[in-house]
Design a protein with these regions (language model features):
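Mature catalytic domains of secreted/periplasmic carbohydrate-active enzymes
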Residues: 7-17, 25-349
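Twin-arginine (Tat) signal peptide motif
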Residues: 1-7
């Protein structure tokens, strides 16, 4: 082999390696931001969102519904998602989050090859579709909540046992359904993420960013972690996340510093205080209820306005939870309180 032939052979061999090298260079892991990005700036600018806890739990009166009741139990008689979003708009909220699937396993959309969803119930309305449509009508950013804990699909209620592969594949499939149907979703909250491995959390983070590259992904820290750290740090089992979520916990008195250190690196992570407006939840007295149940009363307008103002002063978003009843509407007493809260907020601003 002469020098020219040798050079050609070496070039050909090198060309076989180039695609792999190029792929490795172009597939750097997407990770939480170290500085304010467009998405995070928009999130902070919105300041105020609402979440809606509405699912099978509403019809059993149990925040910890395990999905042991038939799909026919879910039967809203006067479902009006537009009323939810209109009320949120009137309150001053700028984004809204729906419990697409809570721990009961019941899905609020017709999920493919899945028999525990609205399509299997007496009221087959695709609540997710109606929610996204109403958000567009009233000009709120839309987002979804999805619970990893799921006794219906896991076979038992266990806060800590890692998810098995068959259920994890369902999680991926359902999140892909939601985000491929509604690309560029502004916000996704995953709850009870400590049941996932670190690799699984990264895979879901990257999956959602594929469809919503400028969206916000929140891995909830949950109640006890939030009360312990007040959003000053990010827990390992809530990583990766774009925002620190403080469940049923107000921001620290000194205010939130978004420059959060995690494993020796500083990230830019806003805080979101996620506050339920229901009465105390009896199985866990320090926490308030998320879902409507008989006898449910909403926080006073003064308390809601105070929570809003405290979050503003402490450099945190407020995600205020609202609870539609079994009719599928926000109760009149809740709407009245929320309208009064809006008047107080506007008067003080």
């Amino acid at each position: 082999m002469n020098r020219r032939e040798f050079s050609k052979a070496m070039a050909a061999s090198a060309s076989l390696l180039l695609p792999r090298v190029g792929l490795a260079a172009s597939s750097a892991r997407i990770e939480p931001a170290t500085h304010p990005t467009r998405a995070l700036h928009e999130f902070e600018k919105l300041q105020f969102g609402v979440s809606f806890h509405f699912s099978m739990n509403t019809f059993t009166g149990n925040d910890y519904e395990t999905g042991g009741v038939p799909a026919s139990t879910y039967n809203p008689t006067n479902l009006d998602v537009r009323q939810w979003i209109r009320t949120a708009r009137d309150l001053g909220a700028r984004y809204a989050v729906l419990t697409a699937k809570h721990m009961s396993g019941f899905a609020l959309w017709d999920s493919a090859n899945y028999d525990y969803d609205v399509a299997a119930s007496p009221n087959k309305t695709d609540v997710v579709a109606e929610f996204v449509k109403a958000c567009k009508e009233y000009k709120l950013k839309h987002g979804f909540y999805y619970c990893i804990l799921d006794p219906h699909n896991e076979g038992k209620f266990d806060w800590d046992i890692p998810v098995k592969d068959d259920y994890y594949q369902l999680i991926k499939r359902q999140l892909t359904e939601l985000h491929s149907r509604y690309p560029n979703t502004f916000y996704q909250l995953l709850d009870i993420t400590w049941k996932l491995s670190q690799d699984q959390r990264w895979e879901l983070y990257e999956l959602i960013k594929k469809y919503s590259p400028h969206g916000i992904l929140v891995m909830n820290q949950a109640y006890y972690q939030s009360r312990r750290n007040l959003g000053r740090i990010c827990e390992l089992k809530s990583w990766p996340t774009d925002v620190i979520n403080a469940e049923d916990t107000m921001p620290p008195p000194e205010g939130h510093d978004p420059h959060v250190k995690f494993e020796g690196k500083t990230y830019y992570m806003p805080l979101e205080a996620w506050i339920p407006t229901g009465p105390p939840f009896k199985p866990l007295p320090p926490m308030n209820s998320w879902f409507w149940r008989p006898g449910f009363t909403t926080q006073s307008a003064e308390k809601i306005a105070s929570e809003y103002n405290d979050c503003r002063q402490r450099h945190s978003n407020l995600l205020l939870n609202l609870s539609p009843d079994t009719s599928g509407r926000l109760p009149d007493e809740a709407v009245s309180n929320l309208h009064e809260a809006a008047r107080i907020i506007n008067r003080k601003s």
